[in-house]
Amino acid sequence: MLIFEDSPVAQLTFFYDLSSPWTYLAFNNVQEVIAETQATVSWRPFLVGGVFNAVNQSVYAARANPIDPKVIHNFTWLHEWARLANLPLDFPTEHHPVKSVLPMRMCCALEHDQEVLKAFTKAAFDAYFADGRNIDDPLVMADVAKSIGLDGEALLSRAVEPAIKDRLRANTEEAISKGAYGSPTMIVDDAQLYFGNDQLPLVRQALAG
């Protein structure tokens, strides 16, 4: 146990996009960190494409050059990290890079209930990265919602409401204002920013105080 009974409870803000394979890993791996440190967590859906457009357009150049050694090694490391975490990974598939606007809006529609959002997020990650399904397909996403007991059609309807669109935009802008440049962006106690699955040991250390 990394936290004493009278220690202040640390807060983790986890900005994420369902299209990111590294976020799939981090979302699953961070659960143990949260349990160990007894931190409170806020799951914050955002649109990583909006982040890239604002502050990290070099990502698109890298995607355009698939023979770049860094890109090749990143895919190798990605699968090694998945094996280390004992997570199934079917990636990349024909759906990559997937448009994530629809699923991220659906996440925003659930943000008021963090436990339900967490369950939906896991189911959506599994659909895309473990099962190779297209999360830009409304039928797939309705099925994902139904798999955890939600009304898929109702959630799809909520996802196109102006307030939900505004929420996704606001989350993305907030993440950018805090220094985000990709997914996942993890912020401890609204102060320390961490990025990526490989920085989870640092997140653990920061949360433990």
What is the predicted function of each stretch?
Residues 3-44, 112-115, 119, 123-209:
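C-terminal cap of thioredoxin/glutaredoxin-like
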Residues 24-128:
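Structural alpha/beta surface segment adjacent to cysteine/selenocysteine redox centers
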Residues 1-2, 106:
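Short, charged low-complexity linear motifs
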